[in-house]
Amino acid sequence: YLLSMTPSAITTSDAGAGIGYTTLRVRGTDGTRINVTANGIPINDAESHNVFWVNLPDFASSVKDMQIQRGAGTSTNGAGAFGASINMQTGDFSLKPYAELNGSYGSFNTHKETVKAGTGLINDHWSFDARLSNISSDGYIDRASVGLNSYYLQGGYYSDNTSIKLITFG
């Protein structure tokens, strides 16, 4: 539901709470015609070209910027950018160590807990960040509960002319 207020975008959710199996349509085209990338790397399924957002629970907590280009556009992985192109950029490294604990609660026993931590810049070149999340909801519809856990790990080497970043999430 992060994109639900975007002009010409429609989002739906099976459970009715915006968590779990959700779909996105832009300018009337379904998800198979929307090219979605994270840091320029395709997120779309290789076979159906759809994006299964349920496999990216709380990925938005690690996104610093998102660009949406509505309509036909260039595609990085085939001819799927007829409806739109969405590029998500993950956060940069932090110069100082940090730790965050976030929690939220809403209707239908919907709650989210997130723990984030980062080392800051180590020896002026290395940085590591991590996030753990839990999202749960009873859902608006009977027997439509959701329980999702996710992680995000990022490590990188940074210098004046070089930036190498390794990211894994699930």
Stretches found by the model and what they are:
Residues N77, F93-Y98, I122-W126, N161:
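Short loop/turn motifs that connect adjacent beta-strands in outer-membrane beta-barrel proteins
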Residues Y105-S136, I141-G170:
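Transmembrane beta-barrel wall of Gram-negative outer-membrane proteins
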Residues V63-I68, A84, T90-Y105, F128-L132:
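Transmembrane beta-strand segments of Gram-negative outer membrane beta-barrel proteins
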Residues P42-R70, Q89:
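Short acidic/polar hinge/loop motifs at secondary-structure boundaries
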Residues S48-H49, I68-R70, P97-E100, N134-D138, ...:
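Extracytoplasmic loops and strand-loop junctions of Gram-negative outer membrane beta-barrel proteins
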Residues S13, G73-N77, N102-Y105, Y140-R143:
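Outer-membrane beta-barrel domain signature
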Residues T23, W53, D65, S85, ...:
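Membrane-embedded beta-strand positions in outer-membrane beta-barrel channels/transporters
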Residues L3-P42, K64:
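Extracytoplasmic beta-strand/coil segments of soluble accessory domains associated
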